[in-house]
Every structure is written in C-alpha cells, then in structure tokens.
C-alpha cells in the first residue's frame, strides 16, 4: 500500500563537495520544513530504537537516532576505514565479473521502533557528512504492530507495510525532507537505502496517538505529556530551547533539557499554550525548575480552557517559584478542559509541566474513536 506524498518541498540530489577543512557544516544543504513543528516520534527519550539492520559494517544503526547533530572528525579512522557518525553499510557488488554492479532491487534496511506511536507528518533522512558515500535513493515504509514485536515478527509475511516515502533520490551532506500524508497510526518504520551507503540521522515528525485502553487502565495520568498525546500549540519565546521539552518524559537532565526564554526588558511575561490528550479533569499540577538556578521563572500560573472557543480560567494563581525545585499543587476541585496554559513571570524558564488527571467520558470516547479510525 502506498500513501500519497506531498512533493512541494525543496529536494537535494547529487554529491556534496569533498570536505575542504574548516566548519564541516558550512556547505550543509537544508531547507525550512513545515512539519518540524511536530514532535519527533523517533526520539530516544520517548523510547524509540533501531531494532535491526541487515548491514552495519562501517557504522552502527543506533547512530540514526542520536539526538545531537552528526559530528565529523576528518582524522578518525578505524580498522574498517573512516569512522562515520551514522549508519553506513558496505558497498554492494554484483554476482559475477560480467555483472559486477548491484541489481535494481538491491538495498539495505533498518527497522525502527517509534518511541510513541502516532500519525506521521514528515520524515527527515539526514546525510550529514556523507558527501560521496550516501545512498542513491531512499524509501520508508510504516507498519502498525501491537505489543513488542521482535525483528523476525516485523519481517514476517503477514505484516502490512505502507509506503510513506517512495523510492526517491537524495543528496549527500543534506537534510532530505519528505512530507507524509497517510492518516494512519504507525508503530514501526522500515528505512531502506538503495543500493547501499550511509545515513547520519533519521527524524520522524508527527502527532502522538496513545492507546486509550492503556490510559484507561492507568486511571490517573499526565494529560499533557507528549507520550500520552499532549502537544505544544504555541509559545511566546523559543530563544534558548523548544517548549516541547516541558512535556518530555522523565526529569530534566541539564539546563537546556527544559524551556528557557531570553531576558525580557519590558513589562510582559512568557507563556506556553498546550493541547491536552483530549478533554480531561485535572486534579494536580507539577511545575519543575530542575537545573534552572539563576534563570528559573520567578512566578508561574496555570490556566485551563474548555474547547477552542472557551475562556481561560486560572486554576493555579501566580505562585512563587524556587530555582532547581519541583513544585507540587493539589487543586481544590478538578479543572475540566481541553487546553492548558502556563504563564511565567517575568521570564526565565521551567523544565517540566505535569498535569495529573483523567479523561472525561466524552474525551475518552473521542480518543477511542480516533484510535480506531487510524487503525490502532
């Protein structure tokens, strides 16, 4: 099965120039990609992994999901050749001296488990530093397989794979972006490079669609968490770090793992607006300022609105924040809503926001219907 693809994005083909010294990213090819506003479903922090690959002779498959940009050291060689920060396979060969070239069908593949199943809006196949050893073309397929399947189970004949990115030429040392229009919920991807070569990073942008049965079994859960389907809709300032960090799993591990704004020189304040998993009852709030010591928010408040046209209602009044501290608040009564907003005064940052509660009856019904509609 093949999904329709939007081909209006900038595309790159052909070799990059050999590295000539200096900043290796100086001639890196990239473009503005509209889907990068969505969460990276292949984020290791969400639990993503590269579960198998048919070949990783020169560089390991796990490099595909490293969160930082690929690095390049022109002097770093190992026993198998140049050490590259990505997934790189050996050069394919034909079957005989008369046919030394790989066939049209030859390719290498890697299986990726998404950290959070969801609807994919765009994919970036990044060939940073693979200037003459990138694949001629790539393709990407998606599947929805329940549970924790093994590589053998994913490769079984009865697994239905949907083409998300048809076989498409790519460029070396470039961020090759592809819009995806398949309205389905996927759990796994199969990345193919034709016929061989190297890919530095893979990013899979989309909307998380959580399993409603799992959330129902939990009872009380974080209704704004990224892994449960919460989203950042807007923010006043993203100067130092993305607002999505505030709804990532776990505690912040360092200062830039949270959200920090530039210094304000006016009388305003900074804020983030979120869309909850669906309509929810919020009973408790956590605001964490971990690792924000001289730059944490001075005060914070939380508001909720019920529906797109609803009015904002403050459920946590402006409250003093302490640096590098997790603040917990039990609400006097449950706050019902579909959206939430945190305001910080006057600027600074928070590392995490947690809104603990449960779906309302109609919210749970809508989530279950969407999950079923998307093939979950």
UniProtKB/Swiss-Prot annotation:
Which species?
A: Streptomyces coelicolor (strain ATCC BAA-471 / A3(2) / M145)
Q: Which InterPro entries match?
A: Allantoicase, Allantoicase_dom, Galactose-bd-like_sf
Enumerate the Gene Ontology biological process terms. Answer: allantoin catabolic process; purine nucleobase metabolic process
Keyword check for Repeat: no
Recorded catalytic activity of this chain's protein: allantoate + H2O = (S)-ureidoglycolate + urea
The gene for this chain is alc
The family line of this record is: Belongs to the allantoicase family.
One Pfam family, please name it. Allantoicase
Q: In what pathway does it function?
A: Nitrogen metabolism; (S)-allantoin degradation; (S)-ureidoglycolate from allantoate (aminidohydrolase route): step 1/1
- Taxonomic superkingdom: Bacteria
Keywords of this entry: Hydrolase, Purine metabolism
EC numbers listed for it are: 3.5.3.4
**PANTHER family given in the database record:** ALLANTOICASE, INACTIVE ALLANTOICASE-RELATED
What protein name applies here?
Probable allantoicase
Question: Taxonomic classification, please?
Answer: Bacteria, Bacillati, Actinomycetota, Actinomycetes, Kitasatosporales
**What molecular function does GO assign, one term?**
allantoicase activity
């Amino acid at each position: 099965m093949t999904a329709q693809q939007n081909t209006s994005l900038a595309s790159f083909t052909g070799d990059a120039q050999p590295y000539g010294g200096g900043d290796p990213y100086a001639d890196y090819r990239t473009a503005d990609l509209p889907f990068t506003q969505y969460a990276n479903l292949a984020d290791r922090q969400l639990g993503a992994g590269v579960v198998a690959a048919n070949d990783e002779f020169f560089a390991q498959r796990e490099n595909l999901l490293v969160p930082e940009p690929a690095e390049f050291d022109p002097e770093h060689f190992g026993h198998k050749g140049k050490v590259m920060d990505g997934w790189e396979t050996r050069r394919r060969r034909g079957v005989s001296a008369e046919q030394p070239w790989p066939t049209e069908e030859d390719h290498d593949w890697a299986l990726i488990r998404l950290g959070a199943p969801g609807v994919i809006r765009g994919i970036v196949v990044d060939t940073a530093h693979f200037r003459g050893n990138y694949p001629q073309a790539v393709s990407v397929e998606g599947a929805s397989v329940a549970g924790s399947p093994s590589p053998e189970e994913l490769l079984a004949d009865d697994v239905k794979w949907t083409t998300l990115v048809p076989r498409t030429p790519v460029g070396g040392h470039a961020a090759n972006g592809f819009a995806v229009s398949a309205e389905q919920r996927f759990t796994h991807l199969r990345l193919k490079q034709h016929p061989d070569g190297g890919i530095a990073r893979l990013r899979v942008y989309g909307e998380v669609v959580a399993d409603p049965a799992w959330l129902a079994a939990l009872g009380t859960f974080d209704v704004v968490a990224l892994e449960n389907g919460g989203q950042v809709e807007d923010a006043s300032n993203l100067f130092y770090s993305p607002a999505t960090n505030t709804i990532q799993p776990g505690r912040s591990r360092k200062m830039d793992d949270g959200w920090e704004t530039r210094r304000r020189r006016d009388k305003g304040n900074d804020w983030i607006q979120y869309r909850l998993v669906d309509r929810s009852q919020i009973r408790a709030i956590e605001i964490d300022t971990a690792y924000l010591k001289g730059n944490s928010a001075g005060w914070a408040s939380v508001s909720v609105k019920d529906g797109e046209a609803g009015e904002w209602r403050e459920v946590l009044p402006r409250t003093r924040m302490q640096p590098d501290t997790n603040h917990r608040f039990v609400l006097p009564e449950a706050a019902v809503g579909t959206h939430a907003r945190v305001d910080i005064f006057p600027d600074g940052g928070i590392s995490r926001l947690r809104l603990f509660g449960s779906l309302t009856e109609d919210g749970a019904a809508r989530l279950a219907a969407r999950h079923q509609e998307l093939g979950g």
